[in-house]
Amino acid sequence: MPYIKPKLANIIHPVIMFKLTQGYEPAMEPSQLYAVTRGQWKMDVNRSKQFKYALACDAGLVVEVYEIETWHQSNETMSEAELLYRRAKGLHAGETGRIEFVGKIAPEEIRKKYNKTNVVKYWGRSQTPFKYISPENL
C-alpha cells in the first residue's frame, strides 16, 4: 500500500490539541481512545471552557476529534473501568488539581476537516501535552 502524506490542518475553530503519549495505541478501542483523550489534565478549567473541540493527536497527526460538552474536576465523571484502564497504562487517574471533559465524537463535517490531518506546525517546540488553538490568534 503506498504512503499517502496527510494534509496539513487548517484550524478555523477553537480547539485544544492533546498529545497522546502514554496509553495510546493505534489499534485501541474507541472507548479507550476517548478515556485517554478526555482526562485528566492539569489545565485551567475557565480557559478550557472557551474551546469547543478536542483533537486527539499522535506524532503530529490527529487521530480523533471530539466535541467538548462540559468540563469537570478529575474523577467526577470517569467510570471505574476508565480509571482502571488509565491506571493500568500508567496515566493520571483521580488526582486532585486536574480536569477532564465529557464529550462525544464531533459532527461529521468537523471530523472530516481535522481527522487524519498533520498538526505539527501548531505544536512548534512545545513540550506540553496540550495546546490551546484560537483561530483569531493565529
Walk through the language-model features, giving the residues of each.
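Short conserved micro-motifs at the rims of enzyme active sites and ligand-binding pockets
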Residues: 67, 77-78, 112-117
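Short beta-strand element of the conserved SAM-dependent methyltransferase core
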Residues: 18, 66, 99-105
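A short pocket-lining beta-strand/turn micro-motif at the edge of beta-sheets
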Residues: 50, 62-64, 97-99
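Short leucine-rich amphipathic alpha-helical surface patches
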Residues: 69-70, 105, 109
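Compositionally biased, charged N-terminal/linker segments
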Residues: 1-53, 58-61, 107-113, 117-138
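Short beta-strand-centered aromatic/proline hotspots
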Residues: 63-71
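Short, solvent-exposed secondary-structure boundary/capping segments
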Residues: 73-104
